[in-house]
Swiss-Prot record:
PANTHER family: FATTY ACID BINDING PROTEIN. GO terms for cellular component: cytoplasm. CDD domains: CRBP4 (cd19465). This is Retinoid-binding protein 7.
Amino acid sequence: MPADLSGTWNLLSSDNFEGYMLALGIDFATRKIAKLLKPQKVIEQNGDSFTIQTCSSLRNYLVKFKVGEEFEEDNKGLDNRKCTSLVTWENDKLTCVQRGEKKNRGWSHWIEGDQLHLEMFCEGQVCKQTFQRA
């Protein structure tokens, strides 16, 4: 059975977030502000249906999807690009591949111990974030 990612999660650490944002083409001022933020994730999981909210004082982002079903994702509030996304389970990792203007883009969420891990990747840049349950 896949992992249960449900809960409210607070950011503990972030590695190479600026490199990831640079690969997305996010402007200098936004990158500098975003690096200072400590976003909170709220994940609602009902079987293979997910709602993931990422909330910060700068921007909020909401995505809803069902595992195994391709969907159009509007990354308004992030890099303002649209892409076609497909989320699948790879063992206990929830993995998303995003096809669009940027190459080799996507993310993975998984739990180790009492922490939620997020790895975001785009055009060779990888950002690793760790969250603690609130």
